[in-house]
């Protein structure tokens, strides 16, 4: 029983490390190559994930905006599939990408983002355009994840493996 629990815990820690690494690499990839996120310990991570709504009624749009038809990078799909259940993110509002920016370039939101998002949502509901949902991950969560996955976890994981292997040798 104890061996089984140790094996399960070891597998869980390995999965945790893998998902953390995927998240961190994804955030850095988006920041460096797609310019659609800010990765900093003091700022928030803003991701604009393309979503298409099938309903033409604004109330239905608000209810069904979790329907994913992801048109972006595979890294965004990885974040949604593996990382989003683990982090305290929320969908703040819906926006259209500004026309002044080039394709693939998404600006960081300002303090008036929610007002602009509300305006864009109403405008998109009237025109039936493809919207983008803003996923906001707090900067301190990014900082804590980075510290844990790249500093603390590599230090404690070998100790855990060593202890579990010694226990297995006693069996």
Curated annotation (Swiss-Prot):
UniProt KW keywords: Membrane, Signal, Transmembrane, Transmembrane helix
Protein name, UniProt field: Putative uncharacterized membrane protein YBR224W
Note: Partially overlaps TDP1.
Transmembrane domains' residue ranges: 71-91, 141-161
Cytoplasmic side: 92-140
Native organism: Saccharomyces cerevisiae (strain ATCC 204508 / S288c) (Baker's yeast)
Entry superkingdom: Eukaryota
Cellular component GO terms, alphabetical: membrane
